[in-house]
Swiss-Prot record:
Annotated stretches, region: Required for interaction with GRIA1: 759-798
Protein name: Palmitoyl thioesterase CPT1C
Described function: Palmitoyl thioesterase specifically expressed in the endoplasmic reticulum of neurons. Modulates the trafficking of the glutamate receptor, AMPAR, to plasma membrane through depalmitoylation of GRIA1. Also regulates AMPR trafficking through the regulation of SACM1L phosphatidylinositol-3-phosphatase activity by interaction in a malonyl-CoA dependent manner. Binds malonyl-CoA and couples malonyl-CoA to ceramide levels, necessary for proper spine maturation and contributing to systemic energy homeostasis and appetite control.
Gene: Cpt1c
Gene3D superfamilies listed in its UniProt record: 6.10.250.1760, Chloramphenicol acetyltransferase-like domain (3.30.559.10), Choline/Carnitine o-acyltransferase, domain 2 (3.30.559.70)
Organism, as annotated: Mus musculus
Length: 798
């Protein structure tokens, strides 16, 4: 009966890519509407690119310049010094009656040329200003006079209201560091983790590399940097992500909802508001009305990663994947209880309202129809090894091209999960761990991992985001997520009964059920992929805990960098957990440069190891604190060097790829690329949009996100500063490893936080007050901070 109902609804209305079109509607009218939408999008794109390209100037500045030239001509002055007369000679001779028109056109041409020359000069000046990185080396909060002058000039040349891509033409290219300096830094970074003999061998290989291979490789790499936008980012995307043949579960990352608040317990309502907000963000993105991100409020960052946020799918290949990006998509693909649906997001009048989208999602939740044969676990193929999925996809494309296109051509993927998630009072620790695990891997078959991101809506109204990593890094998707949470909760809000605001639309067609007419021959492949996905998912040990005894405000009182503070805490905790030091990966962004992505900060330094050993030997607080400050200064120097394009690993990676392309065998570069990161760390950015006042609404903050470990015997750790007085850690490891335990490391991190804080006079009470307490104290503060999830919130009652 359900299939017959879907068939009848399909006969009554067909869904184009956006508007619902009745069969009786004239075909030429639909062609006209589609063409009109396409031309509107094209014109808007051209206009927005023009506005972004002329920043810091505006079209009004051209009009002012043209008017000034016309006024000068009326006063018998020639501001062009004879150039306008030359332009008149090049114009057609229309007779004496058109002499004024010739003067008008020559003035317009001269004004345009002068305007373009001024804009070009401003862009060159801004690029020179943005190439300066001396401000990074200054102590935080102590800005010198030259830096203040530089900042004032940057603000002047940046214009008043820059658009998202306004700075792309002015951003400098990422520099190629010196090979000698990179090798020196590399040897310095591995000294703490290598024995004497191993270090001597590494030094010998490095010297041979500098003598035999480095000059030629460096020359070719320098040539590449002159010919491309970024000398390493394209190779990083291709060889690290798109050529990786492993499961995407290993490289995705996730983002969580508000930790203490659930705006509505209604799954369909939360999905409606969230999808509407995401599409509002896409609308702003297409019109470039999102403000560019400014580091420390003054230095613009590259916005190139925003371009492939929506309408993007990673298409598997036998040897290499590729990213397919569409200019527009007017539907989302939805998964619920093993079934796929296509939900149109637009009507002829524009974007559907949140209430209309809620109605669509509620129809899906109420649909009792079973999954088609092979449909329920089909998405497990996207979690399979990429070469296997590429081969099976050809068969899927042959037999179910329409359904596959509906999923891959969607704006993004939505998963309506049948289970609740989020923090619970009954078992807060286990509930957070399960929440993280559900976002990272799901059940192996309920996420389409190829999509740029998947919006996950749980049965109790909790949200989450699962992000494919190749198209962008965490700060970019984090900006999207902050906007989504703030807008859907504070600006859109919910009615008192928990539904989206507005009224249902009885004329709205039902969602389109996708039909997968798949051959039985792919059943073994689906079963194999499902077993592999469940094995990978079941092997991930996730642990999330909020640390509430102190946060960023306390660390500020200690006059140290909050990120460096946490990195040294992690070194101390990991040493207590494993009894040894290891290569540590901390992600730093290189978006100060055009198309920059990330660089590695090797946080396990000689100075950090000296501090950790002093703490382990229980030396005096004064001595440990002195070593701590030295280690913090070293970490800050490494971080700033990485951000300014003087890091280690991306340069060595590019040299390695160049050596492979030139068929050169370098034992040194091979050894470097075979190194294992047993500790992979990252700080989750927060308050990029400034849409939520965390001081007045401290509960309305995301608890961040996390990722899987980079090694079978390693840890993946992310951390986020929640407001001023709490830190949330996300720890992951493999259950199959006998050397790691996420919960054990979490306890070491808590103890290390208290121990390091007690070194400072303002934090000495921490060690006395909390040492030896049961770890359940982490969640004791929830009783006074958790908001009842059954109480809907909206912008009005906030």
């Amino acid at each position: 009966m359900a299939e017959a109902h879907q068939a009848s609804s399909l006969l009554s209305s067909l869904s184009s890519d956006g508007a619902e079109v009745e069969l009786s509607s004239p075909v030429w009218q639909e062609i006209y509407l589609c063409a009109l939408r396409s031309w509107k999008r094209h014109l808007w794109r051209v206009w927005n690119d023009f506005l972004a390209g002329v920043v810091p100037a505006t079209p009004l500045s051209w009009l002012f310049l043209f008017s000034t030239i016309q006024l000068a001509c009326l006063l018998q002055l020639d501001p062009s010094l004879g150039l306008m007369e030359k332009i008149k000679e090049l114009l057609p001779d229309w007779g004496g009656q058109h002499h004024q028109l010739q003067g008008f056109l020559s003035a317009a041409v001269f004004a345009s040329c002068l305007w373009g020359a001024l804009i070009f000069t401003l862009h060159v000046a801004l690029r020179l200003l943005l190439s300066h990185h001396g401000w990074l080396l200054e102590p935080h909060g102590a800005m010198s006079s030259p830096t203040k002058t530089w900042l004032a000039l940057v603000r002047i040349f940046s214009g008043r209201h820059p658009r998202l891509f306004s700075f792309q033409r002015a951003l400098p290219r990422q520099p190629v560091p010196s090979a000698q300096e990179t090798v020196r830094k590399y040897l310095e970074s591995v000294r703490p983790v290598l024995g004497d003999d191993a270090f001597d061998r590494a030094t010998a290989l490095a010297n041979d590399f500098l003598r035999l291979h480095a000059p030629r490789l460096q020359l070719y790499l320098q040539l590449k940097s002159w010919c491309t936008s970024n000398y390493v980012s394209d190779w990083w995307e291709e060889f690290v992500y798109l050529r990786s043949r492993g499961s995407l579960i290993n490289s995705t990352y996730y983002m969580m909802d508000f930790l203490y608040v659930t705006p509505t317990p209604l799954q369909a309502a939360r999905a409606g508001n969230a999808v509407h907000t995401l599409l509002l963000y896409r609308h702003l993105l297409n019109r470039q009305e999102i403000s560019p991100t400014l580091l420390m409020g003054m230095r613009p960052l590259c916005s190139a990663q925003y371009e492939r946020m929506f309408n993007t799918t990673r298409i598997p290949g036998v040897e290499k994947d590729h990213l397919r990006h569409l200019q527009d998509s007017r539907h989302v693909a939805v998964f619920h209880r093993g079934r796929f649906f296509r939900v149109g997001t637009h009507s002829p009048n524009g974007l559907l309202s949140p209430r209309a989208l809620e109605q669509q999602f509620q129809d899906i939740l109420d649909d009792p129809s079973p999954a088609c044969p092979l449909e329920e676990h089909l998405a497990a193929l996207t979690a399979a090894p990429r070469s296997m999925w590429a081969q099976v996809r050809e068969s899927v494309k042959t037999h179910a091209a329409t359904a596959l296109e509906a999923v891959e051509g969607a704006a993004f993927f939505v998963s309506l999960d049948s289970e609740p998630a989020g923090l619970t009072r009954e078992d807060p620790a286990a509930s957070l761990d399960a929440y993280a695990h559900a976002l990272l891997a799901g059940r192996g078959h309920d996420r389409w991992f190829d999509k740029s991101f998947t919006l996950i809506v749980f049965s109790n109204g909790k949200l989450g985001l699962s992000v494919e990593h190749s198209w962008a890094d965490c700060p970019v998707s984090g900006h999207l997520w902050e906007f989504t949470l703030a807008t859907e909760c504070f600006q859109l809000g919910y009615a008192t009964d928990g539904h989206c605001k507005g009224h249902p639309d009885p004329t709205l067609p039902q969602p389109q059920r996708l039909q997968w007419d798949l051959p039985e021959q792919i059943q073994p492949s689906i079963s194999l992929a499902l077993r592999g996905a469940k094995t990978l998912s079941g092997n991930i040990d996730c642990h999330v805990f909020p640390f509430s005894h102190f946060g960023k405000s306390f660390i500020k009182c200690c006059h140290v960098s909050s990120d460096s503070f946490i990195q040294l805490v992690l070194q101390l905790a990991h040493f207590r957990d494993r009894g040894q030091f290891c290569l540590t990966y901390e992600s730093a962004m290189t978006r100060l440069f055009l198309e920059g992505r990330t660089e590695t900060v090797r946080s396990c330094t000689r100075e950090a190891c000296q501090f950790v050993r002093a703490m382990d030997n229980k030396e005096t607080d004064q001595h440990c604190l002195a070593l701590f400050r030295v280690a913090v200064d070293k970490h800050q120097a490494l971080l700033k060097a990485a951000m300014s394009g003087q890091g280690i690993d991306r340069h060595l990676f590019a040299l390695y790829i160049m050596s492979r392309l030139l068929h050169m065998q370098s034992p040194f570069l091979t050894q470097v690329q075979s190194q294992q990161w047993l500790l992979s760390t990252s700080q989750v950015p927060v308050q990029q949009t400034h849409l939520i006042d965390v001081h007045n609404y401290p509960d309305y903050v995301s608890s961040g996100g996390g990722f899987g470990p980079a090694h079978d015997h390693g840890y993946g750790i992310s951390y986020i500063f929640m407001g001023e007085n709490a830190i949330t850690f996300h720890i992951s490891s493999k259950k199959s490893s006998t050397e790691t335990d996420s919960h054990r490391l979490g306890q070491h991190i808590e103890n290390a936080l208290l121990d390091v804080a007690s070194l400072f006079r303002v934090g000495q009470h921490f060690k006395r007050q909390f040492r030896g307490e049961n770890s359940d104290y982490r969640y004791n503060f929830l009783s006074c901070k958790t908001v009842d999830p059954n109480t809907p919130t909206s912008s009005t009652n906030l």
